[in-house]
Design a protein with these regions (language model features):
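Flexible, compositionally biased loop and terminal segments
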Residues: 1-130
Length: 130
């Protein structure tokens, strides 16, 4: 069960050991995070670095975000039946697919993850196009 790994104090080391050589999937789990704060902080960093407005493009702005080395998510799984992104990864989710699950996060398990990934696998990715 996912909950056991995430909330166990040894979970971080366990997950690192089991996924350290993974080169196919990145999993983002964010606690106490706000997308609006991240965008405001990125703007402040660019201003403090002396970047001129005409020098700012999408790539420049993306490099000022909290985790610029991580790729944008392909999939957001939103638990607890809420159908909103709730101030989460506002910049990075631009082209992500969204899957909404009724179960709350603490009860979300491997079977639920497999179902969400299966739903995602049947999507036609358009990256903003039609």
């Amino acid at each position: 069960m996912i909950r056991a790994v995430v909330f166990d104090p040894r979970g971080h080391r366990f997950v690192q050991a089991r996924t350290g050589t993974n080169d196919r999937l990145d999993l983002w789990i964010a606690f106490d995070y706000g997308g609006r704060a991240e965008l405001a902080d990125a703007a402040r960093r660019l201003i403090q670095a002396g970047i001129q407005p005409d020098e700012i493009d999408e790539d420049t702005f993306a490099r000022a975000l909290y985790e610029p080395e991580l790729p944008d998510p392909d999939l957001l799984i939103r638990t607890a039946g809420d159908q909103r992104i709730s101030n989460f990864l506002l910049w990075q989710l631009a082209y992500a697919e969204l899957v909404f699950v009724e179960k709350p996060w603490p009860d979300f398990g491997e079977e639920d993850l497999r179902a969400a990934l299966a739903e995602y696998a049947h999507r036609e990715r358009r990256f903003g196009g039609r």
